[in-house]
């Protein structure tokens, strides 16, 4: 189950994000909606007995072009040899690359760079 978080900064920037994952995070059909080519690779390797686990969750990321923080689907699977394949989303506003937030507890504000705080609004699934 994921969390609905409200991130706030003293500069006035705030955003509500759905972080983490829900029940659909292990549903191959749902993952394929977001990552069709990558899911084909997963299914092929899983059928060959090479996949240990897989999951899709919303990652909190920055778009440097838009100066926004967002939570978007990311998909990863770990093979039995220990190698992890990771696939993130692109910005839905500009199609640019995203940078994953390193510290979800107090990330830097995308507008001013100060540390942000969050509180949990609820859960989502």
Label every model-predicted segment:
Residues 13-60, 71-79, 84-100:
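Short recognition patches in nucleic-acid-associated and regulatory proteins
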Residues 68-72, 112-122:
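Short Cys/His-rich micro-motifs in 6-15 aa windows
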Residues 8-11, 63-66, 91-94, 109-112:
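Short cysteine-rich clusters marking metal-coordination/redox-active sites
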Residues 97-118:
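Short, compact, well-ordered microdomains
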Residues 1-6, 123-125:
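His-enriched metal-coordination microenvironments in redox/metal-binding proteins
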Residues 76, 104, 122:
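A broadly conserved detector of short glycine/acidic/proline-rich loop/turn motifs that flank catalytic sites
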């Amino acid at each position: 189950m994921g969390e609905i978080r409200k991130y706030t900064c003293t500069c006035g920037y705030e955003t509500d994000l759905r972080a983490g994952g829900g029940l659909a995070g292990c549903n191959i059909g749902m993952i394929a909606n977001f990552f069709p080519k990558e899911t084909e690779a997963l299914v092929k390797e899983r059928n060959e007995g090479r996949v240990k686990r897989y999951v899709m969750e919303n990652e909190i990321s920055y778009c440097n072009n838009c100066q926004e923080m967002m939570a978007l689907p990311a998909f990863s699977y770990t093979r039995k040899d220990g190698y992890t394949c990771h696939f993130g989303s692109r910005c839905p506003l500009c199609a640019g690359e995203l940078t994953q937030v390193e510290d979800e507890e107090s990330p830097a504000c995308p507008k001013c760079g100060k540390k942000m705080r969050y509180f949990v609004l609820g859960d989502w699934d």
